Amino acid sequence: MVAIKLPIFSGMVPSIDKHLLADPNAQYSNNAWLYSGALDGLPVKEPLHTLVNPNATVAFRIPLPGNDPSYMYTGTWVEFENILTDFISAPVAADSFDRYYWTSTTTEPQYNTADRIRLGQHGFRLGIPQAGDLNVTVSGGVSATLVSRAYVATLVSEYGEEGPSSNPFLITGKIDDTFHVTLPAVDPDWLGVTRNIKKIRLYRTIVSAQGTTTYYLVTEVNALVTTQLYDDTMTDAVLASKPLLESTAWTEPPDLDGFIVMPNGIVAGFMDNELWFSEAYRPHAWPAAYSLTLEFKIVGLGIINQTLVVCTEGNPITASGVNPASITTSKLAAFEPCLSKGSIVSTEEGVFYASPNGLILVNAGYAQNITKQYISKDLWASIANEGKINAGRLGSAYYAFTGGVPKFVQDGVFQSNFVQTEISIGSAEGFLIDPSNQNVGFTFTKDTMDIKSVKNDALSGEVIVVRDGKVLWLDLRPGYDIEPYVWRSKVFQTPFAKNFAAYKTYLYGNPSFIFPNPQNYNINQQFDPATQLAIVRVYADGRLVSAQEVRQSGELHRLPTGFKAQFWEIEFEAKVKIKSFQMATSMKELALV
């Protein structure tokens, strides 16, 4: 008995010749979802939000007060035109101000509160600038005892964020003098336009018996007052009970190209080949002493457990530590440059990113090319399209869209003679790969329009994309509608040339679907997802010999006669879940498959 049976469906292994694939593997797969072993499609993308800015390419969601943050249908969307924008929430437990932070390659680091964002109010430059110089004079003292002290000032935002201290003003006076302090003026734009400064703090020194000099808080005044004068008569004994100055080195961040939240409340950022770290739980404070200079320019950052993964134009770097002042780095052995920031995806398994050689997974101190077994370097080069990859985590899969992918075209109407050619098609096509699931392997993805960006929603972990002026959700909950998909089998070789007589395709259930037209058996038909469930195409020795519409599970389809062939391929184009397929050289044999 000669028969072809497909009880299970798997993804592509493009590095293996289509004649040598395992029986379940596809030579071509597009929009297929293969986790169950059945032939299924990716979910239809569900609209969540219509963009206010038609030029926006990426959007992030912040929750509404009192709502479940993971509920995808509620929230305020924050839109950006630069696809390379990073957007994070405050790494502070129960942040009373509900602050959010963002930066990109074209904008300086900024932040805002959720309330202000919902009201459409502008954000502020991240960080608190250094206060200007102050001036001190003395008068009124009669004591012969002299005292030397230094004064500094700091600026404080409405949210309690304190900046670095001003240059110290050193003065000597009598111990009972009144020290007249003229506090620094504040730039008017810092009082609610580019910054949100509300207070000025004044500190002065006390020298301990051991000779240690420490700054203590003298007073805090309203920054909105135009001329700030303060007369200091506080004794050292009283001052010693006041708070200490902590923010001496809490400088604002440079123009970071990107950042990410590390464990222990540290925010890591980068520009060029410099790696920067904030104070723990203080994302406004970025001491320059904490910055590290790396060998290669940084492309982007990822996180795996307690470790920061730095993807560069050379070797990947890992960085770890619980204190931003003592972060240690390790250069991994593999020279695997990162092609694009958008390709970086942080997962439980590690950090994925695209290199010229394939998709790289960094974990446990090593970098592994996980597509090496699936895809040749030449094919990967056309898929990666010079790094134009934007990706997210769909279930356990790496789900990406690119600026151009290999597209299979043919001489005739259908995909009868595949020729791989690189066609620039914007970002309407991409791929899905899951190295943790051998059945899934690799599959192409396709949309009807350009996908501007792919992200994981920070509140739910769900994949969202921006397309056609909308934010869309890939909803994998049970019962989802599926996209039309294409799956083409390996080339099956029979022992000698034969003519297959008939086949059956088994669907999951008998879907309730109203067919407006007669069942189509035209070999030149094209699949219409609006009026059809599935088409099965059969190829013999590379030639399309049958294309028939399938309407019911297990219905019998006869194949044309008058020829024999030794190499057979089966192609499904459908929007219904397929359980299995059977094809034999006679009706009797088909009943025994």
Tell where the protein language model's regions lie, with residue ranges.
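Beta-strand initiation motifs
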Residues: E162, G211-T213, L239-S241, P283-W286, ...
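Loop/turn segments within WD40 beta-propeller blades
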Residues: G302-I304, I344-E348
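Disordered, low-complexity "stalk" and linker segments at domain junctions of extracellular
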Residues: V2-N30, Y35-D40, K45, P54, ...
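Surface loop/turn motifs at the tips and blade-to-blade linkers of beta-strand repeat domains
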Residues: N222-A223, Y290-L294, K331-E336, A381-S382, ...
